[in-house]
């Protein structure tokens, strides 16, 4: 029986980078006889333009029925002035919540070919390989109550809520420990337990879960210190587990240690490893339509999809190898370009990966 993959290109550069990722996926599908069937739909601003909402019910139903979802990016200035509850980003939050995608895996890997593109000195960044495990469906992005009220003195006051239950913390902690167990057996839990009640519970529950993983070394770090340590000595980290907002911020910070956020894929998984896969970067409306966006993060998201949702490690390894081959050839989009390399556009980069994959 075939596996169903739902393609959601989204907004901005989303359609451009997705086109290249789909070419790679289609070749892998043929080369390794994967039995995938691909279908396409809209999300974010594109869905607002078509349906009036950032995620139509029928699209959500198709996502539920699919075996995996491949997403481009959402958002753009065109929709910045509309009501917050129907902005493009709400479609992304909704699909994550409705599919139960609570575990977000964000790798930060510095390819040796891109050592000069890192914001850090080579001796600090060389060999960097961090995995950030971010809780994705709880915390301050979903907490209630939230809103804006007018005080007695006439001044407006806005407020948000950062709730976490024991079960929410426990399940994401287990993802972190499981990932650490198959990597370097080191897990750093990042919180703000010196200030936040939610972080105090977070730390307590993570300590409880740690008893089931005696082979994994657990450490704790406050988020402000973690942000500093990522720049000072990033290779001290192997796997980081943290909450929604902290993970959002730290993973973007970690991305620049690798040279470009355009290189970084991500996976969002449910309890059964059904997932949605997307690049870490946004929709980059400033370069949309110019054919210069880096498609490698989206292509590497395909590799993560094959690995984590389907256990197709041979095909996943081949895609990652093809990307490495292209980098060895000196091909670079503008965001990772350096002297002595050849600057290429979105389609050229995608074609090069396809050619490399075909020749493996």
From Swiss-Prot:
UniProt cross-references to InterPro entries, sorted A to Z: IsoCit/isopropylmalate_DH_CS, IsoPropMal-DH-like_dom, Isopropylmalate_DH
Pathway: Amino-acid biosynthesis; L-leucine biosynthesis; L-leucine from 3-methyl-2-oxobutanoate: step 3/4
Binding site for substrate: 96, 106, 134, 224
PROSITE patterns in UniProt: IDH_IMDH
E.C. number: 1.1.1.85
Residues where Mg(2+) binds: 224, 248, 252
Binding site for NAD(+): 76-89, 282-294
UniProt site (Important for catalysis): 141, 192
Catalytic reaction annotation: (2R,3S)-3-isopropylmalate + NAD(+) = 4-methyl-2-oxopentanoate + CO2 + NADH
GO CC annotations on file: cytosol
One Pfam match: Iso_dh
GO BP: L-leucine biosynthetic process
Main localisation: cytoplasm
Subcellular localization, as worded in the UniProt entry: Cytoplasm
EC class of the enzyme, as a word: oxidoreductase
GO molecular function, one term: NAD binding
Cofactor section: Mg(2+); Mn(2+)
Keyword line: Amino-acid biosynthesis, Branched-chain amino acid biosynthesis, Cytoplasm, Leucine biosynthesis, Magnesium, Manganese, Metal-binding, NAD, Oxidoreductase
Cofactor mode of binding and number, as noted: Binds 1 Mg(2+) or Mn(2+) ion per subunit.
Entry-linked PANTHER family: 3-ISOPROPYLMALATE DEHYDROGENASE
Family, as annotated: Belongs to the isocitrate and isopropylmalate dehydrogenases family. LeuB type 1 subfamily.
HAMAP family: LeuB_type1
Database matches in NCBIfam families: leuB
Function noted in UniProt: Catalyzes the oxidation of 3-carboxy-2-hydroxy-4-methylpentanoate (3-isopropylmalate) to 3-carboxy-4-methyl-2-oxopentanoate. The product decarboxylates to 4-methyl-2 oxopentanoate.
Quaternary structure, from the entry: Homodimer.
Name of protein: 3-isopropylmalate dehydrogenase
Gene giving rise to this polypeptide: leuB
